[in-house]
Curated annotation (Swiss-Prot):
Keywords: ATP-binding, Ligase, Magnesium, Metal-binding, Nucleotide-binding, Tricarboxylic acid cycle. Succinyl-CoA synthetase functions in the citric acid cycle (TCA), coupling the hydrolysis of succinyl-CoA to the synthesis of either ATP or GTP and thus represents the only step of substrate-level phosphorylation in the TCA. The beta subunit provides nucleotide specificity of the enzyme and binds the substrate succinate, while the binding sites for coenzyme A and phosphate are found in the alpha subunit. PANTHER family: SUCCINATE--COA LIGASE [GDP-FORMING] SUBUNIT BETA, MITOCHONDRIAL, SUCCINYL-COA SYNTHETASE BETA CHAIN. Pathway: Carbohydrate metabolism; tricarboxylic acid cycle; succinate from succinyl-CoA (ligase route): step 1/1. Its cofactor is Mg(2+). It comes from the Bacteria. It catalyses: succinate + ATP + CoA = succinyl-CoA + ADP + phosphate; GTP + succinate + CoA = succinyl-CoA + GDP + phosphate. GO terms for cellular component: cytosol; succinate-CoA ligase complex. This is Succinate--CoA ligase [ADP-forming] subunit beta. Its EC number is 6.2.1.5. Belongs to the succinate/malate CoA ligase beta subunit family.
Length: 388
């Protein structure tokens, strides 16, 4: 689950980290009032969406009057912001963050992720702040500094000082960086985060360090023990199809192709998408119906896939283990009848009662194409999507 910038900074403040004074507002009038509360003559106004690249898309602006702050809120509230990280529809803007202005001397980067290879939290820092860190890591990996956190003792101040020296910090900045480093590590562990970024972490004109941005992603599998963070969830930022799928315990991710995929098992689903790509097709989604692929879940899966108007054909790839393939076949037939599927459906069944499942499909009288193998299924669905 992602957090908005203002929510991330709220957590930063709770851990004693330096953040700008700001208010998240819902109306243009509140934006003007926030300027009065903050004081000063310049403010930064930011559209709050779960996506990067807001500045280049016009979603971040420096304003010098309350009227300009109000106008910015009027421009964006209720609208959708399209950035390089969103799809063509963009993300809806329901809040604007109004902040005090920061005099920036230099921009740094500081972030943390769970490194699956070492099974540790790993911090990354760079002198190249305020830019796309993935590009820096790819083009100039030597500019990315790392510190691995021992889960038994946690982040240590000396690790923060080592990173600070490597970043070229000096004087009071070293102690400030170590405090931020340890605070972020505690925040990461306390709240079961999957990713944390401060980009940029800035050196102000007076030499102090300041967290100018906050990007936080929480491990969805740990939400049951983070009741406070559950209240931070903003459903407006969710893909409607993904949110609907979650209600039925379906793992769905929308993509930009035209071949709908319905598979049981995440690994098999990824393999299915790969082989569709290999044969020239483009998957419209990732959809894992899980081990309990009942008729009801298969029906909902079809509804979700077909809600994407780009879908020209559907590939159903089921491996029957505990779940019998003949039962899955009956579920597919029932779902196709109930939903009224008008596009080609290619089905590949393998495993428990696969032959019986294929027979059930063949005797259904429906326009369902039975595939003999995964390769055959991919070739058939690509042809069907192309109208061949």
């Amino acid at each position: 689950m992602n957090l908005h910038e203002y929510q991330g900074k709220q957590l930063f403040a709770e851990y004693g980290l330096p953040v700008s004074k700001g208010y998240a507002v819902d109306t243009p009038e509140e934006a003007a009032e926030a300027c009065d509360k903050i004081g000063g003559s310049e403010w930064v106004v930011k559209a709050q969406v779960h996506a990067g690249g807001r500045g280049k898309a016009g979603g971040v602006k420096l304003v010098r009057s309350k009227e300009d702050a109000k106008a910015f809120a009027q421009q964006w509230l209720g609208k959708r912001l399209v950035t390089y990280q969103t799809d063509a529809n963009g993300q809806p803007v329901t809040k604007i963050l109004v902040e005090s202005c920061t005099d920036i001397a230099k921009e740094l980067y500081l972030g943390a992720v769970v490194d699956r290879s070492s099974r540790r939290i790993v911090f990354m820092a760079s002198t190249e702040g305020g830019v796309d860190i993935e590009k820096i890591a790819h083009d100039t990996p030597e500019k990315i500094l790392k510190a691995t956190i021992d889960p038994l003792v946690g982040a240590q101040p000396f690790q923060g000082r080592e990173l600070a020296f490597q970043l070229g910090l000096e004087g009071k900045q070293v102690a400030q960086f170590a405090k931020i480093f340890v605070g972020l590590a505690k925040l990461f562990q306390d709240h079961d985060l999957a990713l944390l970024e401060v980009n940029p972490l800035v050196i102000k004109a007076d030499g102090d360090l300041h967290c100018l941005d906050a990007k936080i992603n929480i491990d969805a599998n740990a939400m049951y023990r983070q009741p406070k963070l559950k209240t931070f969830h903003d459903p407006s930022q969710d893909d409607p199809r993904e949110a609907h799928a979650a209600k039925f315990e379906l793992n769905y991710v929308a993509l930009e192709g035209n071949i709908g995929c319905m598979v049981n098992g995440a690994g098999l689903a990824m393999g299915t998408m790969d082989i569709v790509n290999l044969h020239g097709g483009k998957p419209a989604n990732f959809l894992d119906v899980g081990g309990g692929a009942t008729k009801e879940r298969v029906t909902e899966a079809f509804k979700i896939i077909l809600s994407d108007t780009n879908v020209a054909a559907v590939l159903v790839n089921i491996f029957g283990g505990i779940v019998r393939c003949d039962m899955i076949a009956e579920g597919i037939i029932g779902a196709v009848k109930e939903v009224g599927v008008k596009i080609p459906v290619v089905v590949r069944l393998e495993g428990n009662n696969a032959e019986l499942g294929a027979k059930v499909l063949a005797e259904s009288g429906l326009n369902i194409i039975a595939a003999t193998s995964l390769t055959d299924a991919a070739q058939q669905v690509v042809k069907a999507a192309e109208g061949k």
